[in-house]
């Protein structure tokens, strides 16, 4: 496993670093450095234990400057690449306040994962909001949405660049979020390709949630425009793939929540998927044989409707 994954497990299950086990090991016919961690206790998993959780909620924290029309995309962006220091927009600041109100109200106690762009930690206001959330809300987990929100599959394949970028984001987020961190990944902009699976595994990612299996979005799935190939590549590397919910092969998560016509289908699909259901436990989420409906939105959505917007969850949805 990657170092970020190991450190996350060690913190969670009371393990420790075991330098006495370090050394060289043979991997793929080559000697490589090996570091050791020990987990003295592990969660008890009963064989055949039923799983009642069927819904996983998450949101992406990317800002206006991260839109593919602004940056990160080789042809769509006004500035495909830049070195500007991130500063949070006033719209996202407003969305943060609305999201925190939702967490204190209708969203209280409901597990949710925030996929954070690591460079956002450079802005003191963003970091303060995230710290406030983590200190007051134990139902929140943090995962990676990349370091600078680069639309990777829109560019020529760059495994080394992706692994480097992702390793940096995982390390920064793990240091900031502590026990709330999870080594999970969502591709910025939903741009994912089969070649990305190996760098994800090498960086220590254990779960990917980048696949939007709709014909409308297949241009984002690499040169072959095939979401099945992306999912198979991810699973072949030993990662769990949690693809986004669709309806009639149409997207119903993320941007679909605000796109005319699609938004009607999206709201209906969310209500149906969450009616009388409960949120998936982490054990269920990490068990690839267990079906889970993955629903996600954007933090910026909370700035809509005069900062009164909230995800269209059915009121009967229960926490794990």
Model-predicted regions and their roles:
Residues 37-135, 307-316:
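Active-site beta->alpha N-cap acidic-glycine motif
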Residues 57-72, 117, 144-149, 243-247, ...:
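Short loop/turn segments at strand-loop or loop-helix junctions that form parts
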Residues 20-27, 34:
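Alpha-helix boundary/capping motif
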Residues 109-195, 211, 217, 294-297:
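Metal-dependent polysaccharide deacetylase catalytic core of the NodB/CE4 family, i.e.
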Residues 35-46, 179, 186-294:
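Active-site-adjacent pocket scaffolds in enzyme catalytic domains
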